[in-house]
Amino acid sequence: MAKATTIKIKLLSTADTGYFYVTTKNSRTMTEKMTKTKYDPVVKKHVEFKETKIK
């Protein structure tokens, strides 16, 4: 059986609210850490979310 190319990652808010999104990414094509601008409902603003590992 082949190794899966998609992995689950956690996108953690840089506003230090503890809010996060869980998404998937292709580990072969996106080798660097993912950053996205998404909505954080705790601070009610769009902030940058950075990739962390799911424990």
From Swiss-Prot:
UniProt cross-references to Pfam families, sorted A to Z: Ribosomal_L33 (PF00471)
Record flagged with keyword Protein biosynthesis: no
One GO MF term: structural constituent of ribosome
PROSITE patterns: RIBOSOMAL_L33 (PS00582)
Gene3D superfamilies associated with the record: Ribosomal protein L33
Protein keywords: Ribonucleoprotein, Ribosomal protein
InterPro entries: Ribosomal_bL33 (IPR001705), Ribosomal_bL33_CS (IPR018264), Ribosomal_bL33_sf (IPR038584), Ribosomal_zn-bd (IPR011332)
UniProt keyword Transcription regulation present: no
Highest rank taxon of the organism: Bacteria
GO cellular component: cytosolic large ribosomal subunit
Protein's GO biological process: translation
HAMAP family cross-referenced by the UniProt entry: Ribosomal_bL33 (MF_00294)
Membership in a protein family: Belongs to the bacterial ribosomal protein bL33 family.
Name this protein carries in UniProt: Large ribosomal subunit protein bL33
Gene: rpmG
